[in-house]
Amino acid sequence: MIPSREEWIAALVERHGEERQNAFLNATVAICGLGGLGSNIATALTRAGVGKLILIDFDKVDITNLNRQQYKMSQLGRPKTECCLENIREISPYTEAIIHTVKLTEENIPEMLGEADIICEAFDKADQKAMLVNTVLETFPDKYVLSGTGMAGFGSANTIQSRKVFGKLYLCGDEKSDVNDGIGLVASRVMVCAAHEAHMVLRLLSGETEV
């Protein structure tokens, strides 16, 4: 039997406290890119009881994604937005979610992300990461932005950290490793970086702005 919404919230309040949980429930977080970073961030924020997620990706689930992304073989070939929504619904049917199966650009970012309190950048390519961060900082100077950079390879997970760059911009990762160096990506290290982003979101929603 699936618990009621009231039972679900009561269980979260027991773990997080009422004031903090209310902050989570009243928040809207956008996750831009639903690959290794984004799909894991979405899972973590759903489990924490964040009230509303905006899930954005244009891609479909591929077999090469399964080593680090929160998808299943039964979902191969389907849009990541639909599959991510399906997966978080299994965790909590009470999490509100909007999906956009589109590629984010400088032109559509204002429309797609205007409702979000916090924006998580979770793209693969450096130029797309920079485009999103720069556009958001220019368009929405009052919004928090978290970006993932440096999570490739089998190096120590302890080198992955969160850093406040300036204002409302935060970076999560080792800021060095790059998949283009031929060192690959593995779930355990990517998930550490995703956890840093998700945890910083929860800290910000709790009013804690320092890393």
PLM region descriptions:
Residues 1-29:
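N-terminal charged helix/coil linker that caps or initiates catalytic domains
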Residues 2-3, 112-118, 122-211:
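Glycine-rich phosphate/adenylate-binding loop
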Residues 31-34, 55:
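Hydrophobic Val/Ile/Leu positions in short beta-strands of Rossmann-like dinucleotide-binding domains
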Residues 47-52:
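Conserved S-adenosyl-L-methionine
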Residues 81-116, 123-126:
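A structured beta-alpha segment of the ubiquitous adenosine-cofactor-binding alpha/beta core
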